[in-house]
Amino acid sequence: ASIEVLRGCVRGCRFCQAGFLYRPMRQRDASLLNKAAQDLCANTGYEELSLSSLSTSDHGQLEELLDDLNEWAPKEHVSLSLPSLRVDNFSQSLIEKTTKVRKSGLTFAAEAGTQRLRDVINKNVTWDEIEKTCTIAFNAGYTSVKLYFMMGLPTETMEDIEGIAETAQKVVDLYYSLPRRGKGKGVQVTISCACFVPKPHTPFEFVPMDTAETLQAKQKHLLESVRSRKIKVNYHDSTTSFLEGVFAKGDRRLAPVIVEAYKRGCYFDGWEECFKYDTWMQTFADLGIDPAFYCQRPIGLDEVTPWSHMDYGVTHEYLVREYQKALAAQTTQPCNRACHGCGANHLLGGPCFDYSQNLV
């Protein structure tokens, strides 16, 4: 079972469409969440409860909520799990309160392999924070962690790809340097690497997506850069990511393509064995449409796009400012620490947060 604990996000990661669309961040009260979770599990019979959101560990009452849930969840054999966690606010207490029934996997989103590129995408985490978080996990008895990255980010070089492998290797080395690690146990670090797809309504809507050939070359280089059997690498198929990029920035001219591709047998495309890339490409060609036009060219900062008429609060000017800061590798603080004038709350008459409180 899954329950949404908050909506929106204060972090401002420049690649994240949901983080911009769902501003401002709103969190549900811990007591209401506890009651809803209890009713949900009682009425469905689920034995695992996921506290879902874009950034669950940013919930201001998370510790209180976990205490409330642990009053009844272990008795009902209901385990608690958190989605991908931020490495800058992970704690020993968080582990203890989510493992009373059974351990779930730990996934940490580092997103990029070098600090320079993390600054470009505004992923405000450092190696020291990654090291601290993994130390807590290993000391708590975990012997495996998953690190989530993206490939094909703006300004990315092969050095950044090598940084992914180096980060994973440093986590492996960290495990073997700890005196409290389990005797006779090995460590497993899994690199999960997605292909970056530029999305509308984000500061990176202006950038072209890497070609499938470029992404495949980067995937090959990543595999060659990993030299430890303790590190496993998973990555997304570049051709399915290409189609995602096409339709993410597409317009009404793509509607006939979808209908025709369906008639030619393109459905259940999320399943690898059902994905017919050649059929999609032939359909584009037969209808006289160049799919690369939509996702593999830069978009002008003043260009009118198929989504320009949509107003979700955040202004075009703010996206341009964030894009320019990205090119300069300048970061932006979480918006509950200082208002950066994105426009998300302009219809409600003021800032989204009371800045006398640090909610993160």
List each language-model region with its residue ranges.
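Canonical Radical SAM [4Fe-4S] cluster-binding loop centered on the CxxxCxxC motif
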Residues: 2-31, 341-359
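Terminal amphipathic helices with adjacent charged low-complexity linkers/tails
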Residues: 25-29, 36, 46, 56, ...
